């Protein structure tokens, strides 16, 4: 019978298991107590011979439930990747012998512990069912990329090369993002000696020529609903027209904006037109187009330029950015080369507190700047003032430990990036206060208006945008889980995820595209989007036991649970990551 359950239990003797455990006794327990139909032992279950033994039982004996008593379920997933069977892993290596003393006194307890793991594995596999294919999402291979900058374009091109249709939504009237307004970029290829062309024009041409990529300019996503494999997004234009598209996964590459340098009056911004930020210098360089860069105030050629690093960032002062934006130091080196490459006699001085050169070739590019005559001064700038025929920069030289003044025709502030990450759903609009005090305040003054702008406009129970990490970046974890957000099937790439330069944004976008493809392919197969531990199943909800307390809808960290019209939990299995938070919050699930 096709529906007949036939369990096979396989016990490994490798990695010291055979020496530490009585595998014959474990086999007997699997057969008698675990009711396994087939029980076999092998010296090295994960090698080709052991895998072939299991596959033979699946093909010839009809085994459809497999218990592997060996190592952790996080190990050897490729070896034990059997199709169309339920697999339970009894962790005898990491969970038993590696955590138990290897002595005669502990041997009996170790054996009992291993026996319990075998019992649990046999019991678990009985109730495991293969995930069902989601027919609704089976044909949805489309990817939505929100943002048409370097990260967004790279993600779209990489996904299109893999054969997936892509839709780009860009709020401005052209592709390229901030990179479209840069004269040159930090080099991406050896010998990392000179600034390179941004390559934006080539990427735009490649996208326009690719029939798998659709571009919506002057557009935003005004509504996003659904789950991996079956997202639905309303794309609205400035004219008011709206189209609805269906997508398997979403990449959020909304980029970053420049810090508002007008908050730095002590550094002269807004007081003198000759004090600009890095974006302002890029504009001057593009206007010069390889010729002499001229200062905005009177159009004279710049003879001396000072770059002020960490302007308004890496600071605990109110209104400043507390973090490093990653690209600013090398961007200043690049911009100093604009002057040196045009005229080596121009005096270029970069005042820094700490010079940071991340990424491949960053140190080489920094040394190239030194070779071209760029001056680097370790110091902290206190004031930039205009007077006479130029600017005066007052700073403390941290090497000489004394206050110094320097003159300049032009001052460039390295002001940093702020992620375009939308509404932070984890932050309340107003401060939490005692109810009585709040009522008094309402009668006296109106609540302050908080202007927010959503990027995705999600219809999730938990809010319209992605939860943020520290400082507004919306990754789940920079190192352990890159690209992943707390909204399954939605991945972030580029400077909205963490501070980075153009080369890093391209690499980032490629990774996000691969993760998005993985999510939609798993959704087509009815699998969870994050099968790291080999578990492809989902929790089951008993509606008859629900008291409508809403704890599960609120506490799910991934927004997997909404509410239906009757106010019962509406479980979106494709959003679930099987963390078990809902099961802990409600024991009757």
Q: What kind of feature is each model-predicted range?
A:
Residues 2-587:
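Residues forming the flavin
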